[in-house]
Amino acid sequence: MRKRKLKMASGIFLLLLIAGLSGCGQKNTEKENLCHIVLEAGEGYHVTDPARTIKSGSDVSFTVTLDDNWQFLGTNYHGETEITKEDDGKTVNLVLHEVNYSESICIQAEKGKYEIVYDANGGQNISGDSDRVSICYRGTHQRINTSTGTDLFARDGYTLLGWNTRADGTGQAVGLGSRTEWKEGLVLYAQWIPWTGEADFVYKKVSGFAVITSYIGKAQQICVPSSLGGFPVRTIREQAFADTECKTVILSPGIHEVEKWAFRNSRLEQLYIYDDLEKISDYAFQDCDMLRTLHINSIEAPAYSGDYFDTFQDKYDRLLSLKDKKKIVLFSGSSTRFGYDSAMLDQAFPDYEVVNMGVFAYSPALPQLELIRSCMKEGDILLDSPEFDAANRQFCYQKELDYATFAMMESNYDAFADLDLREYAQVFTAFSAYQTARQDMERKNYDVCASDYDEDGNEVEEPSYNEYGDYVVYRPNSTSEKPIYGLPVNYTVNAFPKETYIDSANAEFQKFLDQGIKVYFTYSPRNK
């Protein structure tokens, strides 16, 4: 019977084509179509139950466990896939949707080649006895995103504040999850800060959590503990730190809410928070006129990796690497991403490097320009081509930050710490909006790169961005002159009052000119 079936296979296949049948198996009254799916074995991973038999058209799920330092890239399955990575960094849940044929699926995995060694430096390894943990990275960005750390090390009575290239903290510092320049033999040491004594806090227990109602200490530096009296600290109530003389405050992981006026009229100069903080507003820091620096440590998986917002930090990496070289920096919103041909500029001006810093026009330009200016020097050129339908943002009139500001900082929060908060408004309100926006978003990882996707989030075979930061995927001409978002576009003088837009733009440009940086101003590039 088996031999007969083999001989008749070609004939049966022809009959199926004629009949217009499809599927995995021959359907009859006794048996439904079945598909046999096998995940092939390979280096760097193990699949639990790799062979499955399912009904045609249904989904099938697998659990893939990665070896140390290996990364899951995807599969060669041509249908829709759903990939979920667990927090341990090794477990991958893979779902193949609507499987219609029997086939063998190849897993694409890659071993990282950029090693960073993390030293507990007084802490304890959560998953082993060694004081050091080695992690290898793929190097999908010019600089490497460091570990978020809290999944590696712990230390009773201390908060992990960041990493440093020296154990005593005198080397180069980098925040948890933020980027650092890689070099052979790189070791990053955990930096710990002791919790401020419990006696300095007045708190009450609410629904199993500690709520801080007052601070009665006099320290210049306060590290608010993750727990008090054995209860996790969740909330800091209004007026709790009002009028204090402290200059530095660290809000440990697990604190989810800071109420209005919590630090009112304090002498606070710098604040450390973690990106599990959900609710905080500028009212919490009313009359804190000396608050200048906000450090954000990442302990949550990123949501905007691979998004166009994520390109800001990739472009910023390039800008940092060219800090000491002559360069032309292009700036505006997405029109700059789409519209410039930086390779032509590079060819026309061989003495200059070219960096395309355009990302998104509908977010305030001021903080972006300030970060750009910090990487430029005398003789460099800024070519600004603002988009007029976002004039209040593009001409630096709007000082209020928004969720998109933080979306651009997500893959390197350290960049935000270089901004002077006193130059902006609604900083913490914007951070809360950002947290709300990404609350229900799919979480990814820092290895995901925007150049692997097009503008709509579809995977591409060739990089969608070139080395300069230009978006290079073909874009057809517009079919309409109607502006997006319904915003008016007015190119007349009356639309740009001098005391608002023009003076604001000139004030920012003057900072560049004072550093010997040439500033050129033009219309934004556009297609037909």
Please place each PLM-identified region on the residue numbering.
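Membrane-embedded segments
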Residues: 327-412
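Secreted/periplasmic serine-hydrolase-like ester/acetyl group-modifying domain
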Residues: 399-517
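Secondary-structure capping and domain/repeat boundary segments
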Residues: 24-73, 77-194, 298
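N-terminal secretory targeting modules
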Residues: 295-325
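Bacterial N-terminal signal peptides that target proteins for export
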Residues: 2-11
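Structural signature of tandem-repeat unit edges
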Residues: 8, 201-206, 217-234, 244-257, ...
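Bacterial N-terminal signal peptides
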Residues: 11-20
